[in-house]
Amino acid sequence: ELAIDIREKLAEVTDNKITISAGLALFSPSYPISQMAAITGLLESVAKDNDGKDSIALFGFETNSNGEERICRHVYKWDDLINNVIEDKLYTLDQLFVIPGINEVQDSKMKLGKGLIYKLMELLQGILNDRALGKHINVARILYLLARLEPKKNNPTYESYKNLVTAIHRWIQSEEDCKALLTACNLIVYYMRDTK
């Protein structure tokens, strides 16, 4: 939220003549400061290397499935982060789920626990990895996971469930939306951790 506020104020003050690229990572308090600076600096470089700069790289690096290359999966133009991740994916999940640390309990919302969000993230990462290999097994797995969540039709959460299935099915069709959903899930995990 702070990073977005800083970016918006800079754009306002400079009439969009100066852009900002950033690297954002979260660390435990005991993590060495020199390593924090190094990782965040690498993330900033990744953001600056994004086409046209004016980007943000989030969370850190992953090793690809071969273990050969470190990649940052969460790199966005600022407007894409705001519009596609926060105002679309995160907002939709907020409307459909009770998320500890983000919203209040409502009878019409499904409960989102850490186990479910981590499983969803694992399957989304699998879908993104599968695309490069032409496989589709994780699409089937995510649809199976959603089918197991289905409440009875007279349950007040049934409408939220139907909307969730429709949204996720639509989002996993494109790499961009799938990646944005994964980023939104990561943000939810960090919000949930913040409640402790």
Give, region by region, the residue ranges found by the protein language model:
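Charged, helix-rich terminal subdomains or tails
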Residues: 1-196
